[in-house]
Amino acid sequence: MEHGGDIYGNKNIDLDFSVNLSPIGPPREVTGAILDGELQGLLTRYPDPMYRELRRALSRKPELPEEWILCGNGASELLMAVVQAVRPKRAMIPVPSYQGYERVLEAVGAGILFYELKREQGFALTEDFLESADGLKRLADGLKTEEPRAAQSGAMLFLCNPNNPVGKCIEPELLNKIAEYCRENHIFLVVDECYMDLVPDARHKSMRRALAENPYLIIVDAFTKTYAMPGIRLGYMMLSSADLRRAVQMQQPEWSVSMFAQRAGLAALGSEGYLHEARQAVRAEREYVCERLREMGMEVFDGEAPFVMFFSRKELYGPLKEKGILIRRCDGIRGVRGSSEEGGHYYRIGLRSHEENIRLMRMIEELLDQ
């Protein structure tokens, strides 16, 4: 499966815009924690397998019971673990979306239903998803069960909020309706909020407030995107169902969160003012990049995330790569694989510093002028 950030297979890359991270880089506190001499002295110890200190700190962030939080070696591990725990007969993914959901569902042999988001609606999830015959109702048909036990559920729904690669958040009112529908129809709802902390008004748009009333709701998040630390694999999952938590933990290896990851996570959570600064940077740089791309005649899709998706009839990936700049061409993502009729491609660029974003825009402009 293709991901952004494959700098190891692409030599001589100077600027990597193919990954979606906080544009201001990791917090100073994280760098300090990793370089701390005290941590080097802990190399001979096993990490806390229950990551108690980290879980306690995480519970204060969304104000949840500590026991509702599970941590893992990145969000990817947790997505695989929850799918292996539930083993759904079938699942639904609105597309375009993150490709990793398909991978974990294929691993357990689940039948995957795809709901195509419409380009003319900016690839936004709308009320049609609830009302149309090919939407959520198609997943619920004949799959009702009695209890929210992992082994008894036949269905899962995956939503990425804000959505990757588009960058758009689901309207909170619609998301609440979807969550309630899933609860009533015994469908496990996985909401991927790995970019949520970087969007404006994140608290209002997050589904964490609904966990207490919905045992079928599962929220996944990660330090990777929010704190720009993908090299330290650290993700977490929030869910209120005790049965499902036990089932997920049975799928995880022991000590899945290293000592380095636990210390880095604690340092990130303790970085005062970081999220406010990161959100301001995302808003400003997104506005700048979208404006410049539109001035060049690109079709740019609205969103709030730290990345921008656009459509270009001009080939950009190869020429930019030759200049040492890596962007994401979305040809491998279901729903945005380009258009043979138009002869173009969808691209996604992660936001970086203002100076780096200026450099990318100038490079694209030069290519268009050729």
Regions found by a protein language model. Name each.
Residues 119-199:
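Active-site phosphate-binding strand-loop segment of PLP-dependent enzymes
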Residues 59-81, 94:
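Short loop-beta-helix segment that forms the pyridoxal 5′-phosphate
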Residues 1-45, 141:
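N-terminal "arm"/small-domain region of PLP-dependent enzymes with the aminotransferase-like
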Residues 295-324:
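Conserved PLP-binding catalytic core of the aspartate aminotransferase-like
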Residues 173, 333-370:
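PLP-dependent enzyme catalytic core of the Aspartate aminotransferase-like
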Residues 108, 184-185, 214, 296:
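Helix C-cap/helix->beta junction micro-motif
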Residues 85-106, 111:
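Conserved PLP-anchoring active-site segment centered on the Schiff-base-forming lysine
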Residues 25-27, 100, 216-301:
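PLP-dependent aminotransferase class I/II
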